[in-house]
Structure formats: C-alpha cells, structure tokens
Amino acid sequence: MSNLRIPGIAHVLAGASGKGGVGKTTVAVNLALALHQDGVRVGLFDADLHGPNIQLMLGIPPKSSTGKPLNIPVVRSAPRPYIPPLERFGLKSMSLGLLVGDTDTILADGPLAGRMICRTLQDVVWGELDVLLLDFPPGTGEPQRTLLNTIHFDGVLLVTTPQDLSLMDTSRSVGLFRQTGVPILGVVENMSFLYCPHCGEPIEVFARSQREWAITDAAFEQLGRIPLHMSLSRGIETGHPLLHTIPDSPEALAFRRLAAEVSRKVGLSPGKPPRRDR
C-alpha cells in the first residue's frame, strides 16, 4: 500500500538530522522563508512532539501551560481537515507546540507519537502549497519511522555540522531513509564557517572532519554551507528570523543558494516573489 499524499500539496520534504544541536530547525525556518521570498508557496510543520519550537522561532506566542503532563490519545480521523495553520512572514505553519502549553509535557512515545504527529499533520487546512517542509525530530527511531511509513515524502535534506560525530550520526540517518525509500536530496552543512568581520574571508572555526565519506563516498550532493553569525541566533531568539530582518546579508545569501538548489532538485518553478511581510 502506498503512503498517504496530502491533498493540495505538490511536494512534501523533510529536514532531518542524526542528532540534536546541529541547527536543523534554524535551517528549516530560514530555508522556508528563502523559498517563500522566491515566490514558492510554503508550509512549515514542526514534527518534534517533545521539543516543538518552530512557533517560537517565528515569533508566534505559545499557549499557556496547564502545569500537568498531557496524555493525549490519537483520535479517529476527522471527516476533513479542521485546524487552521498560522501565517507569519508569508509562511503557513503548524507546530504541536501551538496545541499545548509552552511547558507542558506530552506523554506519547513510540508508534503512538508517530500516529499523533501524522494525525495532526493531516488535520491542518493547508490549502494549495508548492512545498510542505517537515522539521523532523532528531535521531533515527520513533516517531520518524512511523512518519516515513505513513506519509509520502518527495525527499529529505540531511542537516549536519563539519565534525566527525555529526557526520557519523548523519550516516545512520542515511540508512533510515534508504530503508523507507525516501530520496535523499543532499546534505546541508550548518555552522560551516564564519566570515571574518575585518576582511570578509571565510574562517573555519570547527575542526573539519576527516570522514567526508558521509557526503562524498555516499554520492550525496552538498546542497549548501551555512555560515555562523550572531544575527542567525539573535533572529531565532527574538522570533524575527534572519531571512526576514536582513534578507540581503551574506548569511541570507547562503540560504537563498540553498533554496535554489532545493528548487532544482524537486523541480519547483518559483513564481513572482511576494512583497515583503511587515
């Protein structure tokens, strides 16, 4: 039986990583904004059940906490989607963090967590989109497997950093996506370097891995290298991402190049760029 295709959505992509702390969600938010600014109709879904934070990165206020753990059952499918996505900076977005309080704990593990995420994803009124980007939880277990075995994905971007440990964990993710038949579009190297504030030359601040096999030997294309800069972290902390506040910066240009590569890989035809959202 084939996996479920979400009506009205041309391409469903996943942003994934083998471990946490590589900046996967930062990449997902700014990539989505770069695609939107190229005229692509984009939705963004936070699939991290236990640590959802896309809504905070977009500056969307969280719900008040109940102060109690939430044991949420997976209900029967609704007759039709009914959850309206929130729009911010031109993106349609939904996060499980918008459905519970900002400090509430969700008591759902294993396949149950995966089914809950799939159910929420299908219940959102997405409308017509060129791309829906899912920000996956880190790792290679559940709920990732349930998501990949339920929803049809057109490709995945693997987010890593230059160090050995990150690349080793990336190789484990490769096995998961190969097993489930999801095409790997390529690798995004985050925190790759920084630009010297005096001369503008790139400086590699982390020891580069000697195990580039995770990218080269496996024949995966490196789709982009994202530099370090305080404006990236500041934008995420304040809910005003870099691509919105400083769209012409060198760091934003790296995301624009990444967006162009993703569009090329999946055959997107960007439309007329939108007016900038205030």
Regions flagged by a language model, labelled:
Residues 238-249:
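C-terminal boundary of histidine-terminating zinc-finger modules
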Residues 11-49, 174:
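Walker A/P-loop phosphate-binding motif and the immediately C-terminal alpha-helix
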